[in-house]
Amino acid sequence: MVKNSLFFKKAEFSEIKSYAKRLNSESESGEIGYYDLPNFGDEIIKEAEEFFKDKIYDNIVLVGIGGSSVGVRAILRALRAKKMRARLRILDNIDGFRFDTITQSIEFDKTIFIISSKSGTTVETISIFKAILDFYKPSDISKNFIFITDNGSKLEKFANQSNAKVFNIPKNVGGRFSILSAIGLVPMVALGLDAKALLQGSAQCKADFFDEKDDTLLQKAYHYATHKYAKINVLFSYCDRLAGLNDWYVQLWAESLGKKLGHTRFGLTPIGLVGSKDQHSFLQLIMDGTRDKTVSFIKILDQNSEKKVPNLSLENLDDLDFANGICMSEIINLQCDATMHALINEGISVDLIEVSELNERNLGYLFYYFELLTSAVGIMFGVNTYDQPGVEIGKRILKSLILKEQI
């Protein structure tokens, strides 16, 4: 169960009705493929299960960056309490120290390498892949390597020439919207996690919005998109295991909504915080600083832990005995409530996402929820939510700088 409650004044439906129609039209057009991913993942899961069923491996190394890795890390962190088939490590940066640390600590013959790049030409990913090949010097990469990429990409052509397994990403699904495609499903199957439940959760979110006509998400998008002063959106997650989801949200929100149309610039800056620890750093800025922030809280109702504060009374610290005997998970959720109400009392726009427990189904719901929210705000801004021209400029400059260094 995932429930979203809004603590600000809602708009009249007449104000948001046109945006609902445009979001429906976009989803039905077939041009933006992520909308349909909840309905088309079963074949990928079946194919992945067939591939991994006879494989013997202790480690999985995922090589990818941005949308090819950040969502997988969110899954790994959120579900780390579950027993997994292997240990997953992620190489998502040109960091030689981390590369050495990982490659020197695993046994090649008991490792599956997943090379993940939608375009197939991501310089960081391919550079790390080359370094892996140079380090291990495998005679047959089809035994240990699989590839996730666009159909027809240069990386797919390389994989096919090497007789290696390839999983494709639909052409009309952008990288940061691809977590419900092979990008997320294949690593989940490799880890022994319930990938079907992830899709079921996302399908439930889709049904709630498009079939049940729940306007909560649209109201939230409209309020945040049209807020006069608040151009910073804080996701305050009260669970350590949601730190990865925060990172995924930051990429999705920033890369999708930070756009320029002519001389007009758009964007809502995303910030991910983890409660309660970030109450002791960032909360002061939200409470007493510039009123340029809205806050979305997430709390997990059942954290699957009965750990309590011991009934101990320490000399000179007995003023803190009021927490004795209370579950830590209950305390952290009460901290969420207290912080939220403190912000409401200050007139700050907040909303609360309550999750019954952290499992594959609810995680799938959250992924689809934030993707829909991003699309809705993009429509309200009138920007192209699905491109990233600012990033492409940097890539071209990088190539010219590297070539210049080689002269």
Predicted feature residues:
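Extended, charge-enriched "interface" segments that sit outside catalytic cores
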Residues: 1-53, 312-326
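Active-site phosphate/pyrophosphate-binding segments
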Residues: 48-49, 141-296, 390-407
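Short, charged beta->alpha transition segments
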Residues: 50, 96-105, 219-223, 339
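Glycine-rich phosphate-binding loops that contact phosphosugars or nucleotide phosphates
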Residues: 57-210, 396-400
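Flexible loop/turn segments at secondary-structure boundaries
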Residues: 68-70, 97-98, 121-123, 153-156, ...
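Short, solvent-exposed amphipathic alpha-helical segments in soluble enzyme
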Residues: 77-80, 105-108, 130-132, 161-163, ...
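A generic structural motif
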Residues: 117-122, 173, 187-193, 240-241, ...
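C-terminal catalytic subdomain
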Residues: 241-354, 361, 375-377, 381, ...
